[in-house]
């Protein structure tokens, strides 16, 4: 078998991607016939996703790692090593695109010929960025190793090429392993959790029909059918080689989430939640379309990478230029030191030909950056919807109406992860001003969701708001220049958040309630669930020993985010310290609400003895995945596993050295390696540890030791509690601002339809009926029917006349024969006489 990366990786990952699709198709057509009540459909789906995971592991450990030497990592080891080391040089055989980018691109040549003011602006901006890079001690990184190609061409429409292709780098392979591993655990877990769906009929105790609980056929096979399609869609986003392909699978993920969130569609709450998720995400997708069109109209391509040959080498023209440059290489060329510089194609021809009053007014640096900002914010709008960021965060908590395995997958490895992943993938196209927007949205989201989680009593909703908050952390890190930190936390979060959701499902499966106020003392009844969930809680708060490489996975990734926030604030000063403050405060709130959840659920006296007496540990098919995920929640980020080395290997072109704003001139995005300075690590590590400790201590004081009464705290801070209990009134606000006006407009349109359009149509119908009545009476009735009826009447009368001769008398018939013969003879002789004469 050919294990060269350019050949093997597309085949292995394509097979891993298509296996869930094959499972979906088989279950779609024969799911009900796969065993009793479709039981074997679950095993088929599990086999498909586990096989996809194994293929992903082969791609990682047998192909990628042996052929691509990992650089010296700085995230993870930075808890142990104080000095900074430069990145290890990339393998010469796999540094695709670097040599090609050293040649002058057609876009740059055109800019040099047509706009000297643009060149002056580029050089001035380059000097600014190079000065900052020199301070950082780090040069802009060249393009990472990647493999790009097309499997199938759907067509060409002018400049637009629509293809099904791939873009494979270290991030792609890492995401494949993470998504398929967590999805495998969720699939196996669902075999036990969804076992009741094998009963026929299934009794839904939350739906009353005619005074009785709803009885319906089980939908076990349909659940795994949707789950397989969901995984296929997410993997399609990860492997996609162009923006159009990303958007197709982006929408397919939305459709799958609609099916899974509304799985119990007979429940009004579930169908409403599915509609809400679908509609809110379409709002973000509208912005994403604007960003996509802005990029395509100005760059003329949807492709991420440059065209490559069968060996994975960039295809060049005879002049040495890139034959078909992708988005990233057009925006970050070697001539500009791989910095983000809008190409001449981003400025309209007529704008470039206008005489400039000042150089900066005609420079592509300003006008092009505005277009880059629009494109970047547009793409980010889609990510805001998918990753439930403010102000489109309202759908994710309601998504808890779906089965718990769905929640575990949605909140960890698939839907919400897609938004953060896409920000990371498009990172080379984001200008510093767009990154600032991302950081602001992430900061608001992490603090807003954390405050709501403090008051929630539904165990799954606490975790849902926790997800929103943690996604805000990731967006904050990406917006502040921490590309590795943000995606590092995405991967670690996927493991401990899927663990936490599956533990909550285990609890719900045992006590048949989501309300934590009806739980308590379950540690004795459910020890495996309790302690694996404790591991998840410790991981999400970033528990670890400060300044040492000893800790849970969240310790490494969350500390990286706080360190980057500290570096950014230290570089920019002023109001930028607010990002750091909210990151630290958010860490404290995270520790508080997570241990509040654990204490209320597993410690103390039972609050509902009936539920406590019937509680039991979940079967092994459910606890097995919990133990496996707990191991990864502890160790996946340990320096020995070099996860950050993989991420550094995939770091987007030109982003390692940071950058500086053009529209906001005093904005500086610091190089990420600066956050590893010993003084920043010390202060950020102590701040993160102290904030988490304060949160855990606060939760213990109230919910473990009982020194403070929660009811008294609610009464003391009743206005604040009411605000948080009602989720900052966002649902009510959106109801007033959008839902009610939309319904009002709908009612007015309906009234106009009934009162004007329907009246006009009815009038037209009445007029047509009148005309048809006249025609029916005059033309049809008198002429057509009259003629036909007259002929019929004449025929009838003639028949009556002939009837008189039919008397039945034999003598009369003989007489008629004789007379007829006589007339015939007479006629014959008369004719002969005429002819002879």
Name each model-derived stretch.
Residues 1-10, 67-76, 137-165, 236-246, ...:
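Membrane-interface interhelical loops and short amphipathic "cap" helices
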Residues 19, 416, 442, 536-538, ...:
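Hydrophobic membrane-spanning alpha-helices of multi-pass integral membrane proteins
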Residues 1-14, 33-221, 225, 301, ...:
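Transmembrane helix-loop-helix hairpins at membrane boundaries of multipass inner-membrane proteins
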Residues 56, 183-187, 497, 588-597, ...:
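Hydrophobic alpha-helical membrane-embedded segments
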Residues 125-170, 643-690, 701-837:
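Aromatic-capped, Gly/Pro-kinked transmembrane alpha-helices
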Residues 17-32, 384, 388:
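N-terminal signal-anchor/start-transfer transmembrane helix
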Residues 2-19, 37-47, 160-179, 219-226, ...:
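Membrane-entry segments of alpha-helical transmembrane domains in multi-pass membrane proteins
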